[in-house]
Every structure is written in C-alpha cells, then in structure tokens.
Regions:
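Hydrophobic alpha-helical segments within soluble ligand-binding/sensing domains
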Residues: 147-153, 159-182, 282-302
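Periplasmic-binding protein-like
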Residues: 56-58, 110-122, 140, 184-187, ...
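Hinge/cleft segment of the Venus flytrap/periplasmic-binding protein
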Residues: 297-346
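Bacterial lipoprotein signal-peptidase II cleavage site
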Residues: 18-38
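Short, well-structured alpha-helical segments in soluble
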Residues: 97-115, 127-130, 223-236
Length: 346
C-alpha cells in the first residue's frame, strides 16, 4: 500500500514537472527514483513490523486457573521480547463467561488489527476462532481439554495447548486412598465443553467397578453451591474435571464438602490451592509459558502447528484438607512420578 501511494505521488509529480519543461527522460528518472525510495521505505516498514507484534489475550472469566495461565503468558512474552530485542504489545480482555461479550471482544480485536489472539478456555477460543475466520488471524488457545469436541481442530489458523485430563488416573487416586467408596458425586456444568469427555469417562470407570454415582450440575455460582451442598450425606467423594464454572466457586465448594467429610477430587491444581483435596493434572504456569512460545513462533514463522497436549502426570494434594478429612495420602506415591504438597491460598 505504501509503495502504491508513493508511485501515484511520483506520477502526479511527473505531470506537474512536465508542465514546467521537464522531458520524458527526466520524468522517467524521477519516477524511477520515487519508486526506489518507496521500495526502501516499504522494506524498512516490513522490518519494523517484524520487530513489533500486537497480541490480544482473551480470558473467558476470572478464576485461579485462568489467572495463572494469563500471568504465565504475559511473563513469557515479556521475557522473549527482551531476549530477542523485539516489541510485543499485549492487551488483556475478559469475557466474564458471556458469549455475547466474548463475540464483541473478538470483533474488536480483529478490527484493531492484532497480529495474534490467545484465548484462555474453551468458550473464549470458540468465539475468537469465529471472529478471526475472515482475516485468518492466528488463534493460539490455552487450556482446552478436548479440542476436537470443542470443534477447534482442522482449522488452518487455529492451534494451542490442551490440558486433556487423565480421568482414570484421578479415579485410581480416589480408590487408592478410599477403597471402600460406595457412591461418587459428579459435579460439573453441563454448559462446559471441558467437562463432557471426562464426565463420560468417569461414568464408564465407575460402571465397570459397579460403583454408584450421583450427578449434580449448575451454570452459576449459586447453582453450583446448591448442587455441592445437596451431595453432603449422599456421596463418599466428589469429582469435578477442569470445569471453569465450578472453578469459579471452588473455594466455597471445597469448604462445604470438607466440612461434610467429603474429599473433593478435581482436574486442576488451582482447585487444590482453593481447598479441594487432590488432583492429577497439568502445571498451568508451564502451560501458559508453552502457549506464549507457540504464539511467538507462529508470528515469526507463519507456520501453525498441531495443538500440543501438556503432560499431566503431577499429583497435587492439599495437606490442610487432607488433615481435616483424616486421609492418609501416602498411597499416591505409588501412582505418580511426582506428588506435590500444597496448602489453601489466602
């Protein structure tokens, strides 16, 4: 565009100068010189553009897991910018778990010409993918448990990181320390794509063992709290996958279940630092860092790779919750290469 404008300016200059007695040769020389200058300016602009990127970070809603990922992304972008001597401008957006708001953010981000979009969590990723369809702006999502189920695969401008849950590992943990379980509670949001596959896997696991289960769902904090409270006295343990809706109420849910003597097994370590008993999942700081690296590599190379599944073999236990429940979790040492002890965050 800059070159086109410069050439038009040179042509206008030729017409004006011809009226002042310039010959065609003189005019051609002037046009050639102007075009050369325009090419040099364009080259300089391209170089400057390659050294500067604008990135939109779109968080689905506020809660500990997604906050941890966002902070890790920002830190890594800052570190890589300093290391490479480039400028990476990023701006945070928050959809408050509302599809309309997220769609508006997507429209704004694309219109503002961001070079890449990093959505955190499934609904944010779906909305950003739709918004970027016409421009093919790279979308590098973070923490999508099942990209295929979320319809985020086989799209040439979309990739990212998956925190796919190993549901069997969490179920194995449950029965390792509570071998006499009779009934398991399954607490989740039926609007969360992240929960669909692991809940189905949990049911299949429990059916195979002949263990009963009680399902409770909700789509707001109040509904989740009501569901959790109703499980007290009905179940011996509760399982929640990487469910963003439940995570938003994790502290209150954990407190309610612990007071009721019910261990709360979850899909992410951020639940555990909110008071849940234990998890076997990914490290979200590592996931955020990897996502940022993917985004920068795509910006620099233009190559969009397949999505990456993070290693989730880390067991995290809340020692305060374990003590309150009177549970000996030493059996976890036989199930994972690493057992991390944590306490409830203030």
């Amino acid at each position: 565009m800059k070159k086109f404008v410069a050439v038009l300016s040179a042509a206008a200059m030729m017409t004006s100068l011809a009226a002042c007695g310039y010959t065609a040769d003189t005019a051609n020389t002037a046009a050639s010189s102007a075009e050369t200058t325009a090419s040099a300016a364009e080259s300089t602009a391209d170089t400057a553009a390659a050294d500067s990127y604008k990135v939109a970070i779109v968080q689905q809603l506020d809660h500990a897991s997604l906050d941890e990922i966002r902070v890790a992304i920002e830190k890594e972008l800052d570190a890589k910018a300093a290391e490479k001597g480039i400028t990476i401008e990023y701006k945070d957006f928050n959809g408050q778990n509302d599809a309309t708001t997220l769609n508006q953010i997507g429209t704004q981000v694309v219109a503002d010409g961001y070079d890449a979009i990093i959505p955190i969590a499934t609904l944010a990723a779906q909305c950003m993918t739709t918004a970027a369809e016409s421009t093919k702006t790279p979308v590098i999502y973070a923490a999508i448990s099942d990209p295929a189920a979320a319809d985020l695969t086989d799209i040439d401008y979309v990739t990212g990181t998956s925190d796919a849950l190993n549901t069997q590992s969490i179920m194995d943990m449950m029965f390792a320390v509570q071998p006499d379980i009779q009934t398991v509670g399954l607490l989740y949001s039926n609007s969360e794509a992240n929960s669909t596959t692991p809940i189905a896997e949990a049911k299949a696991y429990l059916d195979a063992k002949g263990i009963a289960y009680v399902e409770k769902t909700g789509n707001t904090n109040d509904e989740i709290m009501t569901a959790a409270s109703s499980m007290v006295g009905q179940v011996d343990a509760v399982f929640t996958p990487t469910d963003n809706v439940v995570m938003a109420a994790a502290a209150a849910v954990s407190e309610t279940l612990t007071k009721g003597g019910i261990p709360f097994y979850t899909g992410a370590d951020s639940f555990v630092t909110a008071g849940a008993f234990a998890t076997c999942g990914v490290n979200y700081t590592e996931l955020g860092t990897y996502t940022a690296d993917m985004a920068l590599d795509i910006l620099e190379t233009g190559v969009v790779p397949a999505y990456h599944v993070m290693d989730g073999g880390i067991i995290t236990v809340n020692t305060e919750t374990a003590a309150a429940l009177g549970i000996d979790y030493s059996a976890f040492n036989d199930l994972a290469g690493q057992v991390v002890e944590a306490t409830t965050a203030e």
